[in-house]
């Protein structure tokens, strides 16, 4: 591609609303442009990178026997209703009506469409296993689009769905996908970690996320300082503390606690650690059930775990009126003792370690001392409802946990029969008996992968693309005018490189050399050849790798083979990670 013909409007400065490096550099390097909040257009260089990423994904999906399809972007309410997702997605779903007043939505993912596609075509156990996938546009009405293409309203995603008649078969495909994902991200030049994860609104049994460690990541990852335990904070467990071994026989004692609003205030007032308190939080489920959740005072409730304990129901903090109705007090003084209404009490396992606890008094400006489980109140549902945090103990080895920020690139699930049951998908097994197939679901964010490549590969000059996903592999820069022999030699090198399969750009623009070199650094092409009459007088051209910034002089007659060798070395460097 000649730059004189390429639509590449690079910018000296990023727009003021671009915050993170990948967003700034995508805009400056003319990969993309912001159209409106959460919506981006991709320019030619950006399209080439997206295509490279998609092709890597496609090759690895095909290698494990997956079949590429394309589902409609539009999905009907009728299709989303059996799975419950028409209601579950709520405001995230872009909804519309067609001219016949039929409710439709822009697809957020396509579990339902793939399920009925398989259901309509498969009748026998002999047709399993089957894996279908697409690389397609998705839509979600994000409440706060941010970080450029990392969280946007429209995005490209690879979503795959596998169908099985045995758990063992699903496990094999799940493991094959996990291996393929690891290979995909390594081929992109990305360093990722896989972590245990929650299945979220997708439902299912097993779940694993592939993360890029990044300070701009929206996910918190919990790591063990000794063993290989790691998990998304939504899923992370901790080693339970020992249960309290002794309790006093002190009677309950009400204490007037005016102007006390926080756990820190309570610590100072009672001159004791927050670990000696039991917090009580009132929640309301989507089915309008009111529950109380008790947890040790130094911990926070993990609402994902709580939702899972409730069968995946959406939950929210109860409003002030509801809290008053249930407890008789304003927010901040709830307690499992003496509730005004009969509700279920959930308790995190952490409160087992608390003896003679301090709890709210279900009365304004009041707390109760000397509280002990069973003697003073009973629990309906015990469980792990705490948010793991730095300093907790590993559930596997007991050593200290620490945390880092991460950005989710891929997510794989064992869905089980969630969708096949919803659509009454049945097939005949080898004994001619009806069975319900089970499914797996596997997603990769293509746009996020592009942004992550940049987040991990840039310097103060611009992007440093790994050769596997670079828009072009090499760029030839002509220093002199078109009338000069050096320009013709640069053009000859450009044509020859393209003819032997090196994807090459030619900067033939009538621009100052400084502008050309700055653009080279900014757009991150791995290999650069600079051709000028002064160097040609010595029989050489300048060769430079973007990553190392080291330049060497190479004889004109050797430059083609030299570029071929360096290109192979760059690919070998990536392949050595596989």
From Swiss-Prot:
GO cellular component: cytosol
Annotated Pfam families: HGTP_anticodon, tRNA-synt_2b, tRNA_edit
InterPro entries named among the record's database cross-references: aa-tRNA-synt_IIb, aa-tRNA-synth_II, aa-tRNA-synth_II/BPL/LPL, Anticodon-bd, Anticodon-bd_dom_sf, Pro-tRNA-ligase_IIa, Pro-tRNA-synth_IIa_bac-type, Pro-tRNA-Synthase_IIa_type1
Gene Ontology MF, one: proline-tRNA ligase activity
Superkingdom in the source lineage: Bacteria
Localization of this protein: Cytoplasm
Signal sequence region: none
GO BP, sorted A to Z: prolyl-tRNA aminoacylation
Enzyme Commission numbers on file: 6.1.1.15
Leading EC class: ligase
Catalytic activity from the UniProt record: tRNA(Pro) + L-proline + ATP = L-prolyl-tRNA(Pro) + AMP + diphosphate
UniProt xrefs under CDD domains: ProRS-INS, ProRS_anticodon_short, ProRS_core_prok
Keyword line: Aminoacyl-tRNA synthetase, ATP-binding, Cytoplasm, Ligase, Nucleotide-binding, Protein biosynthesis
Coiled-coil regions, chain positions: none
HAMAP family: Pro_tRNA_synth_type1 (MF_01569)
Similarity comment: Belongs to the class-II aminoacyl-tRNA synthetase family. ProS type 1 subfamily.
Entry comment, domain topic: Consists of three domains: the N-terminal catalytic domain, the editing domain and the C-terminal anticodon-binding domain.
Entry function: Catalyzes the attachment of proline to tRNA(Pro) in a two-step reaction: proline is first activated by ATP to form Pro-AMP and then transferred to the acceptor end of tRNA(Pro). As ProRS can inadvertently accommodate and process non-cognate amino acids such as alanine and cysteine, to avoid such errors it has two additional distinct editing activities against alanine. One activity is designated as 'pretransfer' editing and involves the tRNA(Pro)-independent hydrolysis of activated Ala-AMP.
Summary of subunit composition and partner proteins: Homodimer.
Name of protein: Proline--tRNA ligase
Species of the source: Brachyspira hyodysenteriae (strain ATCC 49526 / WA1)
Lineage of the species this protein comes from: Bacteria, Pseudomonadati, Spirochaetota, Spirochaetia, Brachyspirales
């Amino acid at each position: 591609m000649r730059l004189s013909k390429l639509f590449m409007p690079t910018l000296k400065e990023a727009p003021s609303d671009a915050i993170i490096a990948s967003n700034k550099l995508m805009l400056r390097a003319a990969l993309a442009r912001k159209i409106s909040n959460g919506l981006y257009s991709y320019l030619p260089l950006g399209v080439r990178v997206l295509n490279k990423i998609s092709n890597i994904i496609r090759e690895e999906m095909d290698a494990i026997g997956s079949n590429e399809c394309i589902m409609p972007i539009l999905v009907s309410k009728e299709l989303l209703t059996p799975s419950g997702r028409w209601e579950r997605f709520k405001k995230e779903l872009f909804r519309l009506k067609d001219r016949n007043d039929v409710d439709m939505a822009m697809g957020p993912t396509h579990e339902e469409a793939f399920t009925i596609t398989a259901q309509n075509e498969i009748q026998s156990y002999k047709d399993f296993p089957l894996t279908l996938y697409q690389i397609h546009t998705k839509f979600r009405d994000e409440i706060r689009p941010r970080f450029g293409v990392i969280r946007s309203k429209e995005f490209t995603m690879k979503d795959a769905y596998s169908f099985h008649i045995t758990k063992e078969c699903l496990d094999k495909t799940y493991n094959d996908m996990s291996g393929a994902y690891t290979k995909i991200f390594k081929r992109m030049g990305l360093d990722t970690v896989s972590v245990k994860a929650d299945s979220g609104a997708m439902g299912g049994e097993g779940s694993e996320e592939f993360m890029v460690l990044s300070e701009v990541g929206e996910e918190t990852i919990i790591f063990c300082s000794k063993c290989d335990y790691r998990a998304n904070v939504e899923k992370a467990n901790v080693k339970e503390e020992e249960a309290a071994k002794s309790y006093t026989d002190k009677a309950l004692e009400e204490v007037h606690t005016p102007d006390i609003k926080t756990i820190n205030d309570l610590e100072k007032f009672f001159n004791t650690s927050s670990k000696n308190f039991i917090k009580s939080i009132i929640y309301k489920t989507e089915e309008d059930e009111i529950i109380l959740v008790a947890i040790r005072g130094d911990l926070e409730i993990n609402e994902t775990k709580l939702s899972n304990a409730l069968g995946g129901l959406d939950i929210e903090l109860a409003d002030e009126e509801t809290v008053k109705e249930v407890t008789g007090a304003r927010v901040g003084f709830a307690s499992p003792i003496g509730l005004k209404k009969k509700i279920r009490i959930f308790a995190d396992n952490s409160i087992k370690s608390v003896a003679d606890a301090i709890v709210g008094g279900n009365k304004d400006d009041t707390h109760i001392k000397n509280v002990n489980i069973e003697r003073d109140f009973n629990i309906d549902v015990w469980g792990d409802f705490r948010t793991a945090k730095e300093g907790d103990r590993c559930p596997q080895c007991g050593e200290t946990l620490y945390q880092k920020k991460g950005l989710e690139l891929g997510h794989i699930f064992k869905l089980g029969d969630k969708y096949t049951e919803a659509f009454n998908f049945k097939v005949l097994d080898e004994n001619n008996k009806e069975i319900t197939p089970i499914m797996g679901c596997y997603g990769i964010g293509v746009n996020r992968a592009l942004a992550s490549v940049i987040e991990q590969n840039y310097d103060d000059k611009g992007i440093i693309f790994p050769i596997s996903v670079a828009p072009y592999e090499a760029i030839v820069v002509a220093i002199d005018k078109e009338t000069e022999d050096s320009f013709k030699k640069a053009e000859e090198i450009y044509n020859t490189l393209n003819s032997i399969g090196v994807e090459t750009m030619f900067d033939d623009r009538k621009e100052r050399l400084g502008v050309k070199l700055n653009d080279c650094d900014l757009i991150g092409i791995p290999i650069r050849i600079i051709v000028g009459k002064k160097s040609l007088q010595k029989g050489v051209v300048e060769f430079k790798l973007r990553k190392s910034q080291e330049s060497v002089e190479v004889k004109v007659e050797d430059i083609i083979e030299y570029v071929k060798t360096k290109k192979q070395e760059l690919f070998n460097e990536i392949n050595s990670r596989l």
